Curated annotation (Swiss-Prot):
InterPro entries named among the record's database cross-references: Ribosomal_eL30-like_sf, Ribosomal_eL8/eL30/eS12/Gad45, Ribosomal_eS12, Ribosomal_eS12_CS
Assembly and interaction partners: Component of the small ribosomal subunit (SSU). Mature yeast ribosomes consist of a small (40S) and a large (60S) subunit. The 40S small subunit contains 1 molecule of ribosomal RNA (18S rRNA) and 33 different proteins (encoded by 57 genes). The large 60S subunit contains 3 rRNA molecules (25S, 5.8S and 5S rRNA) and 46 different proteins (encoded by 81 genes).
Keyword Ubl conjugation attached: yes
A biological-process GO annotation: ribosomal small subunit biogenesis
Crosslink feature (Glycyl lysine isopeptide (Lys-Gly) (interchain with G-Cter in ubiquitin)) location: 85, 95, 114
Protein's name according to its UniProt entry: Small ribosomal subunit protein eS12
Species annotation: Saccharomyces cerevisiae (strain ATCC 204508 / S288c)
Lineage per the UniProt record: Eukaryota, Fungi, Dikarya, Ascomycota, Saccharomycotina
Gene3D superfamilies named in the record: 3.30.1330.30
Keywords: Cytoplasm, Isopeptide bond, Ribonucleoprotein, Ribosomal protein, Ubl conjugation
Amino acid sequence: MSDVEEVVEVQEETVVEQTAEVTIEDALKVVLRTALVHDGLARGLRESTKALTRGEALLVVLVSSVTEANIIKLVEGLANDPENKVPLIKVADAKQLGEWAGLGKIDREGNARKVVGASVVVVKNWGAETDELSMIMEHFSQQ
């Protein structure tokens, strides 16, 4: 036993959580995955127009680079119906929208393979309340 006591100073480090900026596209990807799991997506023009005319649509995602201008006019017209106005988001790439909507195969590493493009996707059921969903709804309330 020694007469000298060792004093150990413990410094507490405060960890500041850095919230990564979540873009609208990232939030949309999470919302579409959640709706896909809960069987709440209508994928493609035929299913989407049926959901829009029945009034089941909660959100419409449209590809802005569709070759047929009539498709854009039809979907925008149904989404902007005065009786049942539905929020509309436009994305650039059909293959990316198809991947988000589950129109492809997933390999062992988790990468998407054989992805089919989608011109329009309609969310009929949110599935679960997430932070990304509230972010998208807040985005539409600001517009």
